Curated annotation (Swiss-Prot):
Belongs to the peptidase M14 family. This is Adipocyte enhancer-binding protein 1. Residues 116-166, 252-266 have a biased composition (Basic residues). Residues 100-110, 211-223, 267-289, 326-371 have a biased composition (Basic and acidic residues). The gene is AEBP1. It comes from Homo sapiens. Residues 383-540 form the F5/8 type C domain. Residues 45-55, 1108-1137 have a biased composition (Acidic residues). Residues 555-985 are annotated as: Interaction with PTEN. SMART domains: FA58C (SM00231), Zn_pept (SM00631). Residues 421-624, 1006-1158 are annotated as: Interaction with MAPK1 and MAPK3. One of its GO terms (biological process) is negative regulation of transcription by RNA polymerase II. Keywords: Calmodulin-binding, Cytoplasm, Disease variant, DNA-binding, Ehlers-Danlos syndrome, Glycoprotein, Nucleus, Repressor, Secreted, Signal, Transcription, Transcription regulation. GO terms for cellular component: collagen-containing extracellular matrix; cytoplasm; extracellular exosome; extracellular region; extracellular space; nucleus. Residues 41-387, 1108-1141 are annotated as: Disordered.
Length: 1158
């Protein structure tokens, strides 16, 4: 009876235990059932399921009843069933979990609570969810345990079958399993998982992605929170959690949130037997999961612990496909590859493969990954960095240091690549850095002032015609503070770099691996001669753009073609510009070079191909030396700029193009450029490509017209016999066998064809503006004496410098300053000269003869042979700058180039015509005070560049009467209109008559001389009266000298008259400066009159004059001169030859002044 009475009590206790969440009555209620289940389950499972048995729940036979029990009271039966189920679940999962995975589990899982799927013992709802997965299995074994609550635990084993890691766990092994659970919890945020109760629902969702399972899981989450058992983790999941940090694990949770597709991926992959082996350790962890619950969510690549349904409840802004983008921002490249590769292997999502295909390639196969790696490694080839700016002087002098220097002229600042020696060697400007002694501790250091990736060094020997010094081997060191230095090694020892074998050829020494540092040092090891070297450093700046030293750096804003152009590229670019702007551009050729390459020119004007009346013509030329390529590239950039800005409506460019005819010639020496381009920007020496193919220097191969002009000026032939402008070319220079380059002949023909007004040639190697004269003129004795006296007084030698100046010196200086002041670097005085001292004094301009005197230059020839004022622009120290320097150089020169072109509209302009309006060509326009004129063009128009001011301008032409007027020039851009109308004269007829008479000279008739007989008689009387007065004066002087005593020294008399001659103003105070008789002094003043009469009378007596002139000359000489007058005339002629002294009075009016002064 006691046993009978105790039965209901035991059943009640069991029910209470089942209701308690923390209770573990499973052993009491399910011992028999577990043993029966194990007998059948172990017989079916292979050795592998033994591991799963730890986690797998009991067989799924009681699933139908469990559903009813759950419907009646889920909370009460769940704990009890959970305790009974785990042993049976493990058996059923091992057998049928693989066969019946997805379809049945979701239905039963919906009925049960979401937690028990992985923890069969504690969570009956898991069994309820999983028995659906294995209803056939449960049907086999439900007969064994239909009456008992064991049916509910049988419902759990089917879930465990689909989720083998989470379902199988016998009660006996549970304590041992708890030791394994603590491993995964630390990396996972357990506290967040507990409230979510991800155990059952996550496992069910993982096994069956059906929507019903998710819905029920969410509904039952609050109830099973107390009984929650965390799902078993796959061994791979545990490793992943240990490898990655918490923030990375969180990102994984965010990624799977939106995509349900990824949930299905692990479900299909992980039910395989290998996955069942992994969960074996996980069941041990089930005991502790309530204390340290592990988040079921795992990376979408792994299926055991991947709890996506719980993350659906959480909000993440990163979608499943886009998770790669946030990873790209947070993760490194290695982390991205590690996370992406497993995703592709396990899940192989189409979205990810598509992204990789778009970025790296189209193949979705595994070899594609190898290809991606190859593409990533290809850019790791040797980085080619540009020069840091040693040659171009971007590296300032204070950034270069050395251990010592031989003397001041051989300091570290002279150690730049292609540095040239001064005018004389052994001065303060020599051609290299030389150390003080031959010790091997010498070094030269460069500070880049920013973090730089160094890739190589270019070395060169000393520039000298006497010494042969260069470094053959050297070491390289790097530092970030100039205190601690690290030598470049090859892995075993300090790496030795091989230098030069001669003093001129640059040699590149590349670093096998780039080095990032701020300072670089060169330690010479061996050398030839003295320890001297020049160098350039190759490096890329890695400092941020906002660095201190980069704040003021120039950055190009124009979208132009910044690269070096070969001959074909140049021709193609000019063609493209012409196609873009066909209405304002025209391409033509000046001629051909000695190798047959055409010298192309680009014309930019609103009416290309024609000279418009009143429109000045301007020219820019470059490439006159083949290795000076900066000007070549600047003109190509200028073509593009003018074309694009004109199309875009830039008012400044439109005004310039519409009012000016611009000619741009980028390469006057195409043969030389091809030679220089073969060596590149840094490896051609100073002279490679400078000359033409025939060996001519185009800049100095023009006719020497300076000597012709200066010789005529010394003979006083200018401007009557020799003009001061438009001098003709000597015939010897034009002969076919003359040694003149082909390019120069083409340039001269081009100059004569177009009426250029202003021009400039762009050169390199220096940083200044040079203006004529380029040829030095030997100063006269007076100028040398004045210069010596000025030097003694400490004044400037202006007298000597004036000998090198042109008549338009002030205008040339204005033009030079207009370019230099608009240039960004020419007027910076701290930069100094490139090769020697700064001849410009910080102004950026210099007279060519004072700086570098040369003969036969293009500037002097253009000034003396044409109307064009031409200057030379030396744009930089580096003749052949690197391609990376072009944007900066364009910004430095752009404004200056435009400003100089606008100067062509300064001064005066106009048209010279006759009274009928017919234009007069070759008329001369002269300006008072400027001994240099200009000629009118074929249309009668002219342009004269003048500084602001007021000028007296005269226009004269052969056969026309000269005309003069006053013209004002303002400071504003815009020439003053100053037209001339010339009237015809009879000089043309006179010259024809003279030609008929043998071109004899025509006597000049002074208009002030008397023409009538009465006037001539009156003049004779006046002359006779003056002669009498002079005779009386001479007698008085003679009497005064004779009355002196013997003690008086006669030589003292001559100096006294000399003083009176210079100081007295009254006419009668003059005394002849010499001791000659009074006749000599008198005839000196009177000689001019009598000689003029004689020159005019001699043709009357000796030759027969034409009838036309007889009527003019006969009345003049009707009256015969008196005999005394004729005798005096002959005496005066003889005395004039003897004395050689003559006063400047040459007219009759002068005679009256002489007599009055006398």
């Amino acid at each position: 009876m006691a046993a009978v009475r105790g039965a209901p009590l035991l059943s009640c206790l069991l029910a209470l235990l089942a209701l308690c969440p923390g209770g573990r009555p499973q052993t009491v209620l399910t011992d028999d059932e577990i043993e029966e289940f194990l007998e059948g389950f172990l017989s079916e499972l292979e050795p592998e399921p033994r591991e799963d048995d730890v986690e797998a729940p009991p067989p799924p036979e009681p699933t139908p009843r469990v559903r009813k029990a759950q419907a009646g009271g889920k909370p009460g039966k769940r704990p009890g069933t959970a305790a009974e189920v785990p042993p049976e679940k493990t058996k059923d999962k091992g057998k049928k979990g693989k066969k019946d995975k997805g379809p049945k589990v979701p239905k039963e899982s919906l009925e049960g609570s979401p937690r028990p799927p992985k923890k069969g013992k504690e969570k009956p709802p898991k069994a309820t969810k999983k028995p659906k997965e294995k209803p056939p299995k449960a049907t086999k074994k439900p007969k064994e345990k239909p009456p008992k609550a064991t049916k509910k635990p049988k419902e759990k084993p089917p879930k465990a079958t689909k989720k083998p890691p989470s379902g199988k766990r016998p009660p006996i092994l549970a304590p041992s399993e708890t030791l394994e659970w603590p491993l995964p919890p630390p990396p996972s945020p357990g506290p967040e998982e507990l409230p979510q109760e991800g155990g059952a629902p996550l496992s069910n969702n993982w096994q069956n992605p059906g929507e019903e399972t998710h819905v029920e899981a969410r509904e039952h989450q609050p109830e099973p929170e107390e009984e929650t058992e965390q799902p078993t983790l796959d061994y791979n999941d545990q490793i992943e959690r240990e490898d990655y940090e918490d923030f990375e694990y969180i990102r994984r949770q965010k990624q799977p949130r939106p995509p349900p597709s990824r949930r299905r991926r692990p479900e299909r992959v992980w039910p395989e037997p290998p996955e069942e082996k992994a969960p074996a350790p996980a069941p041990e962890e089930r005991i502790e999961p309530p204390v340290k619950p592990l988040l079921p969510p795992l990376p979408p690549d792994y299926g055991d612990g991947y709890v996506i349904p719980n993350y659906d409840d959480m909000d993440y802004y990163f979608g499943p496909p886009p998770p790669q983008k946030p990873d790209a921002e947070r993760q490194t490249d290695e982390e991205k590859e590690e996370l992406k590769k497993p995703k592709k292997e396990d899940s192989s999502p189409k979205e990810e493969t598509d992204k990789w295909a778009v970025e790296k390639g189209k193949d979705h196969k595994e070899p594609r990954k190898g290809e991606e790696l190859e593409e990533e490694w290809t850019p790791t080839e040797k980085v080619k960095c540009p020069p840091i700016g040693m040659e171009s002087h971007r590296i300032e002098d204070n950034q270069i240091r050395a251990s010592s220097m031989l003397r001041h002229g051989l300091g570290a600042q002279r150690g730049r690549l292609n540095m040239q020696t001064g005018a004389t060697e052994d001065d303060y400007y020599d051609g290299a850095w030389c150390a003080e002694d031959d010790a091997r501790t010498q070094w030269i250091e460069v500070d880049t002032r920013r973090t730089t990736r160094f890739t190589g060094v270019i070395t060169q020997g000393r520039d000298s015609s006497i010494h042969d010094d260069f470094v053959t081997t050297f070491f390289v060191g790097f530092s970030n503070d100039s205190q601690t230095w690290v030598m470049y090694t090859n892995g075993y020892e300090e790496m030795t770099f091989h230098g030069n074998v001669d003093k001129d050829t640059p040699v590149l020494s590349e670093l096998p691996e780039p080095v990032v540092a701020r300072f670089i040092r060169i330690y010479p090891l061996t050398w030839n001669g003295s320890l001297c070297m020049r160098l350039e450093v190759l490096g890329c700046s890695v400092a941020p753009v906002y660095s201190y030293y980069a704040q003021n750096e120039v950055v190009a804003t124009d979208d132009l073609d910044f690269r070096h152009h070969s001959y074909k590229d140049m021709r193609q670019l000019m063609k493209v510009v012409n196609e873009e702007c066909p209405t304002i551009t025209r391409t033509y050729s000046l001629g051909k070079s000695s190798r047959g390459l055409k010298i192309y020119a680009m014309e930019i004007s609103d009416n290309p191909g024609e000279h418009e009346l009143g429109e000045p013509e301007f020219r820019y030329t470059a490439g006159i030396h083949g290795n000076e390529v900066l000007g070549r590239e600047l003109l190509l950039l200028l073509m593009q700029y003018l074309c694009r800005e004109y199309r875009d409506g830039n008012p400044r460019v439109r005004s310039l193009v519409q009012d000016t005819r611009i000619h741009l010639v980028p390469s006057l020496n195409p043969d030389g450029y091809e030679v220089a381009a073969q060596m590149g920007s840094e490896f051609g020496n100073w002279a490679l490509g400078l000359w033409t193919e025939e060996g001519f220097d185009i800049f100095e191969d023009f006719p020497d017209l300076n000597s012709v002009l200066w010789g005529a000026e010394e003979r006083k032939w200018v401007p009557y016999r020799v003009p001061n402008n438009n001098l003709p070319i000597p015939e010897r220079y034009l002969s076919p066998d003359a040694t003149v380059s082909t390019e120069v002949r083409a340039i001269i023909a081009w100059m004569e064809k177009n009426p250029f007004v202003l021009g400039a040639n762009l050169n390199g190697g220096e940083r200044l503006v040079s203006y004529p004269y380029d040829m030095a003129r030997t100063p006269t004795q007076e100028q040398l004496l004045a210069a010596a006296m000025a030097a003694a007084r400490g004044e400037d030698e202006d007298e000597v410098s004036e000998a090198q100046e042109t008549p338009d010196h002030a205008i040339f200086r204005w033009l030079a300053i207009s370019f230099a002041s608009a240039h960004l670097t020419l007027t910076e005085p701290y930069r100094g000269g490139c090769q020697a001292q700064d001849y410009t004094g910080g102004m950026g301009i210099v007279n060519g003869a004072k700086w570098n005197p040369r003969t036969g230059t293009i500037n002097d020839f253009s000034y003396l042979h044409t109307n064009c004022l031409e200057l030379s622009f030396y744009l930089g120290c580096d003749k052949f700058p690197h391609e990376s320097e072009l944007p900066r150089e364009w910004e430095n020169n752009k404004e200056a180039l435009l400003t100089f072109m606008e100067q062509v509209h300064r001064g005066i302009k106009g048209v010279v015509t006759d009274e009928q309006g017919i234009p007069i060509a070759n008329a001369t326009i002269s300006v008072s005070g400027i001994n240099h004129g200009v000629k009118t063009a074929s249309g009668g128009d002219y342009w004269r560049i003048l500084n602001p001011g007021e000028y007296r301008v005269t226009a004269h032409a052969e056969g026309y009467t000269p005309s003069a007027k006053t013209c004002n020039v303002d400071y504003d851009i815009g020439a003053t209109q100053c037209n001339f109308i010339l009237a015809r004269s009879n000089w043309k007829r006179i010259r024809e008559i003279m030609a008929m008479n043998g071109n004899r000279p025509i006597p000049h008739i002074d208009p002030s001389r008397p023409m009538t007989p009465q006037q001539r008689r009156l003049q004779q009387r006046r002359l006779q009266h003056r002669l009498r007065l002079r005779a009386q004066m001479r007698l008085r002087r003679l009497n005064a000298t004779t009355t002196l005593g013997p003690h008086t020294v006669p030589p003292t008399l001559p100096p006294a008259p000399a003083t009176t001659l210079s100081t007295t103003i009254e006419p009668w105070g003059l005394i002849p400066p010499t001791t000659a008789g009074w006749e000599e002094s008198e005839t000196e003043t009177y000689t001019e009159v009598v000689t003029e009469f004689g020159t005019e009378v001699e043709p009357e007596f000796g030759t027969k004059v034409e009838p036309e002139f007889e009527t003019q000359l006969e009345p003049e000489f009707e009256t015969q001169l008196e005999p005394e007058f004729e005798e005096e005339e002959e005496e005066e002629k003889e005395e004039e030859i003897a004395t050689g002294q003559a006063f400047p009075f040459t007219t009759v009016e002068t005679y009256t002044v002489n007599f009055g002064d006398f």
